[in-house]
C-alpha cells in the first residue's frame, strides 16, 4: 500500500503558528478540532481516531499515491484540459478522501498568477469565484522546488506552505 503525505516544514510551523515542538502541535490541533468536535475534546489517547492530534495528522495523509500532476487532471502547463478548459471562469479541481475519517480534501490547479497546485482553495485564478468567495488555500510545492526528491519507502511526500485542516 502506498501513501501521500503533505508535510509542513518546521520553519513554516514556527513562523506562521509559533509551533516549535510536539506540545505546540497538540495545542494547535486542539484549537482546530476540539471546537469542531466538542464531544471528543477529552480524548487524550493519540491512537484514537477521535483525538485532535490524530485528526490533524491524518488529514495531511492520503491512502494513495498523489503525484503533483495527478491530483487534478492537469498533467502539466500544456495539458489538453489546461489549454481547452475555460480557466478564466473555473479552476480545475478534484477531491479525495483523507486518512481522517469522513473528510475530503480539495485540490485545485488555477491558471494565471496563482498557477500551481493548491489544497482547499476556493476562487478563480487570483480572485473570488462567481459567488464572491476567495479562500487562497495551501500551496503544494512542485517537485522542482523540493529538489526533485519526494519519494519515500511507502509512498511520496509534498511540502506545503501552511497547515491544512477540515
Question: Which residues does each PLM region occupy?
Answer:
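Mature exported/compartmentalized surface modules and terminal targeting/interaction regions
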Residues: 1-166
Amino acid at each position: 500500500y502506498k501513501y501521500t503525505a503533505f508535510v509542513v516544514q518546521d520553519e513554516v510551523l514556527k513562523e506562521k503558528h509559533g509551533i516549535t515542538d510536539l506540545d505546540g502541535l497538540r495545542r494547535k490541533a486542539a484549537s482546530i478540532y476540539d471546537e469542531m468536535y466538542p464531544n471528543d475534546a477529552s480524548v487524550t489517547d493519540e491512537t484514537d481516531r477521535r483525538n485532535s492530534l490524530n485528526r490533524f495528522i491524518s488529514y495531511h495523509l492520503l491512502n494513495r499515491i498523489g503525484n503533483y500532476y495527478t491530483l487534478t487532471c492537469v498533467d502539466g502547463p500544456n495539458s489538453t484540459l489546461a489549454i481547452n478548459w475555460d480557466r478564466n471562469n473555473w479552476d480545475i479541481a478534484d477531491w479525495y478522501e483523507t486518512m481522517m475519517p469522513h473528510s475530503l480534501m480539495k485540490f485545485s490547479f488555477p491558471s494565471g498568477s496563482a498557477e500551481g497546485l493548491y489544497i482547499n482553495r476556493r476562487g478563480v485564478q487570483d480572485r473570488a469565484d462567481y459567488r464572491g468567495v476567495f479562500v487562497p488555500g495551501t500551496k503544494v510545492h512542485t517537485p522542482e522546488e523540493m529538489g526533485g526528491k519526494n519519494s519515500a519507502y511507502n509512498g511520496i511526500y509534498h511540502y506545503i506552505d501552511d497547515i491544512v485542516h477540515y
